[in-house]
Amino acid sequence: MDKTASLTSQDAEKHDPDALRKERATDPPDLFEHGALDPVYQAKAHLIASAIQEIGMGKYQWGLFVVAGFGWFSDSVWPLMGSLILSPVVNEFQFNSPFLSLALNAGLLAGAIFWAFGCDIWGRRWSFNLSLLIAGAFGLAAGGTQNFVALACLFAVVGFGVGGNMPVDSAVFLDFVPGSYQYLLTILSIWWSIGQLVASLIAWPLIANFSCPIGSTTCTRADNMGWRYLLFTLGGMTLLLWAIRFFVFPLMESPRFLVGRGRDAEAIAVIQRIAQFNGRPSSLTLEELAMVAEKAAPKDAVATQRRQVLSQSSDFSTDHVKGLFATPKLAWSTSLLIALWGIIGLASTLYNSFLPFLLANRGAEFGDSSYFITYRNQVIIAVLGVPGAFLAGWAVEQPYLGRKGTLAISAGLTGVFLFATTTARSSNALLGWNCGYAFHSNIMYGVLYAISPEVFPAKDRGTGNGLTATATRVFGLIAPVIALYANLSTAVPVYVSGALIIASGAMALLLPYEPRGRASL
């Protein structure tokens, strides 16, 4: 009887609005200092963050963890695809190998600009749902190409779709997750590792068994179907992931985006729907939003009116960019992140895009350059990336590490393992060093993908992600140009990549914001 009474009391307290409001006192503090953001937006965003915190991490957020992870999966699979099919495609079409990577990276650049900047203008939902559809459909079509020009053009369109995944999906996930669970954005990189593993596992038997021998003088379509089967398989898989997103998961528009547009009533409706989906009540009301906005608004009526007009505008303007440079601290943070993404983008693309090619080349020196050995090694390397995501999720929450420390250490070790690959005197030694590289680079990327959207205000988050993604894609375009003039059988690309990544680790320590324990607005 006492136990029943106690449960009834607890249940009543759980649904009592006053009790729920008391929970807000334990919310993580805001990441941004007072005055860094528009005062009206900052007040509203804080209230929205508190409402999401009191709803908690429920069914909706865990479902979003899965479907947002599809973006990480796709962003891993398709750039890797350019390198997985490179050797058999070069054998058949006889072209200069870096041109395929160049086409893909051109598409990735266009996609990063279009989708990331667009999601701050027309909202998150369309960008979130369409990017996978484009990647899957054109990836499937690429498998039927008869020449290199058609393949490169279709790969560019695939890149356009894939380019929007990471900037948009990270913004979407962070917009809905409680502040105390923001570390899950780092763990989302597990999907990136799974993507590499799945692509490598499928490529291994297909490329090894249905390809012309390496170095063959004549290679016909009939003898070289492996890379086509691979594109058909992963294109179809990407379309399946899109269908799950579009038809199964009810993605709602971001309440933080809606508040940033002045659409407060719609934001409240979304919060209530999430609470209902999770089986939790929400105490947030439209009157509360209006009250905090009134208190935070400047006394100057003209300034208030101007702010409302700007918040309701749905056209592109420079305000989203200006918001990322509103204070010296924000400007330094944004500039440093853009530089980090550019440097790491150049280094990683230069190395990752040609890794199977490098493995085959170096394997030839060691007498084991077969497709079977090359793609077996690629699978082993991919497996080692999986535990890195979990270690990254743990490390970013440690008091003496946080996001910045974890990023700096993992980047430094990634560069060290890259340098170590140049000392390999056997295929197994080369494989071992590359496993170390894969493990630490997955930690590095997991943190980098998380800290960037965390330190951008939600109303400008898509634009911020777009700037960093554009930087990494622009520098990614430079990588195949370097490869056109570099000797890929030497260690020069490795030295360049390693030095750049180590330098980026040192730069990470200069970031002014540490999101650990703080709520992003």
UniProtKB/Swiss-Prot annotation:
UniProt-annotated location(s): Membrane
InterPro entries named in the record: MFS_dom, MFS_sugar_transport-like, MFS_trans_sf
Basic and acidic residues: compositionally biased ranges: 11-29
Compositionally biased residues, Polar residues: 1-10
Gene3D superfamilies: MFS general substrate transporter like domains
UniProt xrefs under Pfam families: Sugar_tr
Keywords attached to this entry: Glycoprotein, Membrane, Transmembrane, Transmembrane helix, Transport
Membrane topology: Multi-pass membrane protein
UniProt-recorded Gene Ontology molecular function terms: transmembrane transporter activity
GO CC list: membrane
Highest taxon listed in the record's lineage: Eukaryota
Region of interest: Disordered: 1-29
Main location: membrane
Entry's induction text: Expression is induced under iron-depleted conditions.
Transmembrane segments: 62-82, 99-119, 126-146, 148-168, 187-207, 229-249, 330-350, 379-399, 404-424, 431-451, 466-486, 491-511
SUPFAM superfamilies from the UniProt entry: MFS general substrate transporter
Glycosylation sites: 209, 487
Function according to Swiss-Prot or TrEMBL: Major facilitator transporter probably involved in siderophore basidioferrin transmembrane transport.
Family to which the UniProt record says this protein belongs: Belongs to the major facilitator superfamily.
PANTHER family: SYNAPTIC VESICLE GLYCOPROTEIN 2, TRANSPORTER, PUTATIVE (AFU_ORTHOLOGUE AFUA_7G01740)-RELATED
Protein known as: MFS siderochrome iron transporter 1
Source organism: Ceriporiopsis subvermispora (strain B) (White-rot fungus)
Lineage summary: Eukaryota, Fungi, Dikarya, Basidiomycota, Agaricomycotina
